[in-house]
Amino acid sequence: MHIVLASTSRYRQEIIARLGLPFCAEPPVCDETPLPGETALETAVRLARVKAQSLAGKHPEALIIGSDQVALLDDKQIGKPGGFEQGVEMLKWMSGRTVVFHSALALYNTASGRLQECVGITRVTLRRLTEAQIRNYLTREPDALHCAGSAKSEGLGGALLEKVESDDPNALIGVPLFQLITMLGNEGVEVLK
C-alpha cells in the first residue's frame, strides 16, 4: 500500500522523507475556513481529516496523511495572513507572547476505511519584536506568509522564538512525527524495518 501526503508544503514533505519510506505528495481539496463556533483544536482535526479523505478517490489502496495546524492566542484562531501587512499585524500582536499551536494529523487507510487522528500541542513564546524586525523577517522569509501567524520555526524564523514547549519538535512544523510513526505501525508499516 503506498503512502500519500495530502500537502504541498516542502517542510512537511521533508519531515515525512526523514522516515525513509517512499511516498508521493499531492495538494488536498479543502476549504480551510473555520466553522462557526469551532475551537482551534476542532478546526485542526477536521481539516486534517478532510485533507486526507479528499484524495481517497484518486488513491483507493493507500495510506493518506492529512495535516493541519491552527494557532491560538487570546482564544482567537490565528490563520495564514492574507498578505504582507496582515503578516506584520499578526506578528506585532504575537510579539512577546505565548501562542499555542494545534498540529493535527489524520492517517486514512482508503482500502479499509480506517481513520486515525492525533494532535500535537506546541507552546511557542515569541521574543519581543520591533516592527522593523518583523518587516525585515517577512521580507527575508516570504514563505512565512503561508504559515499560521506568519511564524515559522525553520530558517530565519528561529530568530522570532524565545521558547518552545512540545512533546514532539516536529509538531511545530505541522507533522507530529512521533505519533505518525505509531499510526503507520498500526497499519503494518514498520519504519525501522
Curated annotation (Swiss-Prot):
Classification via InterPro entries: ITPase-like_fam, Maf-like
Gene Ontology annotations of biological process type: nucleotide metabolic process
UniProt KW keywords: Cytoplasm, Hydrolase, Nucleotide metabolism
Enzyme class: hydrolase
Names of required cofactors: a divalent metal cation
Record-linked Gene3D superfamilies: 3.90.950.10
Molecular function per GO: nucleoside triphosphate diphosphatase activity
Protein localization: Cytoplasm
NCBIfam families: maf
Stated name of the protein: 7-methyl-GTP pyrophosphatase
Organism for this UniProt entry: Chromobacterium violaceum (strain ATCC 12472 / DSM 30191 / JCM 1249 / CCUG 213 / NBRC 12614 / NCIMB 9131 / NCTC 9757 / MK)
